[in-house]
């Protein structure tokens, strides 16, 4: 039986709306320049996008000459349909692969004889949409696929108090307190503005969602009634180091971007 989050992301109207209206505009996208720079300085590689969704990253992966193939993994067939349509415009070969990041059994067989270095990328806080235990499981699964020449690049949202960028709130909204509180409200508004979610939620639950920043867990949480249907975690550097340690991965580089940490991991 699918989880509440899977129900939302498998909704037929989500894929195209998310790719067109949201994923190109959300604040964390600006920090993907570090991922592009890192990949562009490598030799010939294949890029494996974990949770590729509608394939937004194909817009820049297609421009990197050393990327010889892109394999996008996602569990949502509707999102992969959007990705496949976008891939037709690409020069680079793109393979859309349906698999679950909790298992990756099909994908393991698929890349068994691969000779080129693989760079796994997990963008726009995809890992932060899982629980603590699930994050560890996903990273251990990916580690089990990696050879010494392979790398895993994560983009993880920073805690609000670490974000120095100005957050522009609507004029009618006033908030008392420090910049951290302002950033937290800005974060909630960012998620509140994801109107693409409202239609799927309304059709499934007949209720509008509520958005909440939990200061104890550092999660942005979306509720429908009392049900938690989506979380988006905010990370600290210390937390990232512990997560890598749990998954038995080594941090090659940890870059602090404007809104995100870009973490490069190896075995």
Annotate each PLM feature:
Residues 2-34:
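Class I SAM-dependent methyltransferase Rossmann-like catalytic core
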Residues 54-67:
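Conserved SAM-binding loop of SAM-dependent methyltransferases across substrates and taxa
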Residues 69-74:
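Conserved SAM-binding motif I beta-strand of class I
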Residues 83-84:
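Conserved SAM-binding loop
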Residues 90-106:
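Conserved SAM-binding strand-loop segment of SAM-dependent methyltransferases
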Residues 129-141:
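A short, conserved alpha-helix within the catalytic core of class I
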